[in-house]
Curated annotation (Swiss-Prot):
Residues at which substrate binds: T12, A13, S14, G15, K16, T17
Keywords for this protein: ATP-binding, Magnesium, Nucleotide-binding, Transferase, tRNA processing
Protein family according to the UniProt entry: Belongs to the IPP transferase family.
Co-factor(s): Mg(2+)
Residues marked Interaction with substrate tRNA (site): T101, R123
Region of interest (Interaction with substrate tRNA), ranges: 35-38
Cited PANTHER family: TRNA DIMETHYLALLYLTRANSFERASE
Record-given protein name: tRNA dimethylallyltransferase
Organism encoding this protein: Hydrogenobaculum sp. (strain Y04AAS1)
Coiled coil: none
Binding site for ATP: G10, P11, T12, A13, S14, G15, K16, T17
Length: 298
């Protein structure tokens, strides 16, 4: 096959990582993660990273890339991922990209929007406003000036809410106006796990309780003890931002679990809608991919 990569996307808790792992074994290739939270070290349970055992079976890239307090964005991801894709292809293999961070996948396929340079001074001011008035205050502002992008990222994505406001203040243009869709810059076979919302909801509830059993609370405590504070982007990941108030005595464990489930369901719903709008082929199991690959050959 003359392609640059195979992409397996989909909502959280939809089984895409398991499918990608089995396909990687079948094709004797390597996996590139497209998950914005798996890049952070020491955050294993809450991000549902592949186990160390699986990472011994198959080479995984873009996992444990930076410390939780280090800056990481879509631009950095694309630069690193494209370099890895090239390295894997030079080995005569087809890389498999798997993840649910659709902004990463979109940027890989269509390139990065030509926006203004980062304005760190303005960014600090916006972060200060978020801390004083709440993130919802900034999100409502973003909805007024760029409803399209606001609905795409959701109300809890602090980093992207602030960046979008920063761009609008400096350019007078909404962030969504910068990203013009062109032909893909890579030739890929794209798939996405197409579970029903009801199936996703059941999986999310089951996985949340599994994370609690596996020690999510202890993982959060360790992060705080290492000095990785709540305000950091990494600590805004679903699972961590809900557990920290419980650890600090500001909420009950029941409330933390309920909030994790609610926020995960909302995020999964946005992911599901995004992937359904793509030209990717819907799948449910690895057999669906095998059948598709066979149909291309025969």
């Amino acid at each position: 096959m003359s392609i640059d990569a195979i992409i397996i996307g989909g909502p959280t808790a939809s089984g895409k990582t398991e499918i990608a792992h089995e396909l990687a074994k079948l094709l004797n290739t390597e996996i590139i993660s497209a998950d914005s939270m798996c890049v952070y070290k020491f955050m294993n349970i809450g991000t549902a990273k592949p186990s160390l055992e699986k990472r011994k079976e198959i080479k995984y890239h873009m996992i444990d890339v930076v410390l939780p307090n280090e800056y990481f964005d879509t631009y950095i991801y694309v630069e690193k991922a494209k370099s890895i894709i090239k390295q894997i292809k030079e080995k005569g293999k087809i890389p498999i990209i798997v993840g649910g961070t659709y902004l990463y996948i979109q940027a890989l396929l269509y390139g990065l929007p030509e926006t203004s340079e980062p304005d760190f001074r303005l960014r600090k001011k916006l972060e200060s406003i978020a801390n004083k008035k709440g993130l919802h205050f900034l999100y409502e502002k973003l909805k007024v000036i760029d409803k399209v992008y606001a609905e795409k990222i959701g109300k809890n994505d602090k980093k992207r809410i602030i960046r979008a406001l920063e761009i609008f203040i400096n350019t007078g243009k909404p962030f969504s106006s910068f990203h013009k869709w062109h032909e893909p810059t890579m030739k890929v076979l794209g798939f996405y796990t197409n579970l029903t919302q009801e199936e996703l909801n059941k999986n999310i509830e089951k996985r949340t309780y599994y994370m609690i059993e596996q020690g999510l609370e202890v993982e959060c405590i360790n992060l705080l003890c290492l000095g990785y504070k709540e305000a950091m982007t990494s600590s805004q990941a679903i699972g961590y931002k809900e557990m920290i108030p419980y650890i600090e005595g500001k909420s009950s464990l029941k409330e933390a679990i309920e909030n994790i489930i609610k926020n995960t369901k909302e995020y999964a719903s946005r992911q599901r809608r995004w992937f359904q709008k793509t030209t990717f082929t819907p799948i449910r199991t690895i057999e669906d991919i095998k059948h598709h690959l066979q149909s291309l050959v025969l």
